[in-house]
């Protein structure tokens, strides 16, 4: 392979990596809230009151893993969906206030965005109360390393 061909290959790989990184975030995404009540349900993804989609794969994870971050359902416009999303983490930002939090994907949804746990995520970034008043927030999210 010539040097020019190698440089073109490296450039193509860098572009692909940049595109993949960009695809792992979204802005102005609708985020509703859901009452998973993880603390009241012993952080049990399979509890009848929770019944999270990801319980099939993640319910047997250690309590320290299940309780490390607040919970969210994910059906956003960018990133993996279904089983491939289970257990991944999102950095969720309320651009209106700058409040941020890391949340773990434990469920799927159908609203085209996020369905944040009320106790562990939504109220933590709805610092001005507008999300509660409107019934939703518009947020930005980015997939991040959970550091598990």
Swiss-Prot record:
Pyrrolidone carboxylic acid sites (modified residues): 24
GO molecular function, one term: RNA nuclease activity
Disulfide bonds: 54-86, 75-109, 89-146
Domain called Barwin: residue spans: 24-148
One GO BP: defense response to fungus
SUPFAM superfamilies associated with the record: Barwin-like endoglucanases (SSF50685)
Coiled coil: none
Signal peptide bounds: 1-23
Pfam family, one: Barwin
Keywords: Antimicrobial, Disulfide bond, Fungicide, Hypersensitive response, Pathogenesis-related protein, Plant defense, Pyrrolidone carboxylic acid, Signal
Keyword Mitochondrion among record annotations: no
InterPro entries named in the record: Barwin_CS, Barwin_dom, PR4, RlpA-like_sf
Keyword Amino-acid biosynthesis: no
PANTHER family: WHEATWIN-2 (PTHR46351:SF18), WOUND-INDUCED PROTEIN WIN2 (PTHR46351)
Role description: Shows antifungal activity towards B.cinerea and towards the wheat-specific pathogenic fungi F.culmorum and F.graminearum (groups 1 and 2).
Subunit and interaction comment: Monomer.
Protein name: Wheatwin-2
Organism: Triticum aestivum
Gene (name only): PR4B
């Amino acid at each position: 392979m010539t040097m020019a061909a190698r440089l073109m290959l490296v450039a193509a790989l860098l572009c692909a990596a940049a595109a993949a990184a960009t695809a792992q975030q979204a802005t102005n995404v609708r985020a509703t809230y859901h009452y998973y009540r993880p603390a009241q349900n012993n952080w049990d993804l399979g509890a009848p009151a929770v019944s999270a989609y990801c319980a099939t794969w993640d319910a047997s994870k250690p309590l320290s893993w299940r309780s490390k971050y607040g919970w969210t359902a994910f059906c956003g416009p960018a990133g993996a969906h279904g089983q491939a999303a289970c257990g991944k983490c999102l950095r969720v930002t309320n651009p209106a206030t700058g409040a941020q939090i890391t949340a773990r994907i434990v469920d799927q949804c159908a609203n085209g965005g996020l369905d944040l746990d009320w106790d562990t995520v939504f109220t933590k970034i709805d610092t001005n109360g507008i999300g509660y008043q409107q019934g939703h927030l518009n947020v930005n999210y980015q997939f991040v390393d959970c550091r598990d």
